[in-house]
Amino acid sequence: MSVEAQMGRDPDQLILETQAAEIMCQSVRTLQKWRVTGFGPHFYKIGRSVRYKRSEVIDWIDARRMAHTSAA
């Protein structure tokens, strides 16, 4: 399923780590490293599983939008 089709779903849906990685164009390993360092969107730990709320992933991406390179 394409990222565009996934993003049209319920924003409060908890998504898999692999789905979050696909939406953010990152590897699952990168998300794992980010969790250790406290970077990245908030996540939910349910048993051994890690989940992300779709809307929080999108909000996290939107918060990093830059108008030009000097803003970084």
Task: Go through each PLM region and give its residues.
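A detector for short, charged/polar N-terminal pre-domain segments
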Residues: 1-13, 70
